[in-house]
Amino acid sequence: AGVVLKVDGSPVNASVMYQPGGAVNSTYIKRGLTPFGEYMPLRNLAEVVSPYAKSVVDFKAGSELVTHQVAGAALGPIICYEIINDRLVSEMSASSKALIVQTNSATFSGTAESRQQLAITRIRAKEYARSILSVSTIGISAFIDSNGEVVDEIGENVQGYLTGDLLLSDHATNASKWGTLIKIVILSLFALFGLRSFRKDRAV
């Protein structure tokens, strides 16, 4: 379940796994907070620019990677826009055999945001070879296989539920093993070709 809790007097965005009797089995606190939504960067300046900045409550970020254990398998919780954070997704994928992405898209109802976030989630499934259960308060919710294909989904603002299999995997892809290095090499090549083109243009 996705809940807002209080830790040391500050709100935290959390993924909580409950036992059938209601006791808490495990709690993951969101580590990658969303600027302007969960905290206000440069608050003093922002409040001068816009009085609305004062209404944004600063959440507290978690510091621990926690997985939910289900039938002996580790499922990795990812909360909302953590899905775009390479480091957080990589760490969670390496520590789990499937992922659960939880999000509240109510603010963006009727826009392309839900479909965009689902597309990003599908890329992550393929990138790390992990099946993903994507759960949204208003949709789109979906089962996504490890190839990034949507197995089943519920559309936005549609009442219903999904049942399905979340296949487990501990396969390490090249992206998970060499992701950072690959990005550095690609960026370096782009920079090299860009520099060569710049020199050619100046030579002409």
Where are these regions (language model features)?
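Selective detector of the "anchor" transmembrane alpha-helix that sits immediately C-terminal
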Residues: 177-200
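Cytoplasmic C-terminal tails of single-pass
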Residues: 203-204
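Soluble catalytic domains of enzymes that build or remodel membrane lipids, polysaccharides, and related
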Residues: 1-178
